Amino acid sequence: MALYSPGNMITVHKTITFDGTAGLGLAGTAVPIFTVTGEVLVVALVPFCTTLLTESGATATLALGVTGSTALFIAATNSVDIDANEFWVDTTPDANGIALPAALKDIVITDNIIATPAVTNTATGVIRFDLVYIPLSTDGAVVAS
């Protein structure tokens, strides 16, 4: 059986509306995006900003990773650099289109996918997260948190 056949790939989506509160942009508190059970292969993870992010104070940052490795996918990025209609695939988000970087595809994980705000709060904005994955273990699954 081919690992990357359309029949074994699953897609899940989650939209986060940041408001600066705990779990939604408060610095130092994780933003839960996807809950992972078992082992899964991330085929592709695509964060797309639909409403630009703002900060409550200078230099608010946002990283994307998993519990225990908070920058596995994307290192800390200044929140105000993530604008509407941009793909947040690295620390310099891109409009229009971009080749998906290696850090956002073909990654094996067992932990929940989270965003980590730091320094000051990410006060407003919206990011949609689209994930395509393949379960590796019999209990491998991902759901929106």
What are the language-model segments listed below?
Residues 1-145:
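Surface-exposed, low-hydrophobicity beta-strand/loop segments enriched in small/polar/acidic residues
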